[in-house]
């Protein structure tokens, strides 16, 4: 069935799947246009709970030791940043994957490990980490903007080395971010996911090749982006 679909159909199906991966209670009923909302920062903040805002506004150098000490659980941090990332995506189109279920499973494992052993897994214990869509991550597409690479899990023989290193350090992968086609362009746009807007001025481009990461981080949708 997939082989008979056009690349346009495949791309639309991927975008629909991405949209549907965001929990319904995190989806905006209406996304404000750039004409009505140029800068997305305050809008994102206003749609968070006080607890979510407190966690997501912690700088990494404060969040990391808090996670290692159990002052903030990995599950709490993952949920807070995932909600913020979902809002950021709806304003800027910055994501390619939203893998909340896998992220929460990993966060629970890390919280249990810390509770049972009294020590963190590694220096990034429980830290939510976003990945640019060039790093192979098991269970996700890595298209680099090519529709032909959608659903081609067989292409990925092994996860990226940096993914393995970060996971061993305790990272929690929860989203992947948009890039230009082949990353050979200074404009984050491709035929699969489309155009990524600038988070601060939504009339403008997020540039590239890390435009998805740029907009996500500008809206504090991730504490650490690779």
List where the protein language model places each region.
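Gly/Ser-rich catalytic/binding loops embedded in alpha/beta enzyme cores
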Residues: 2-226
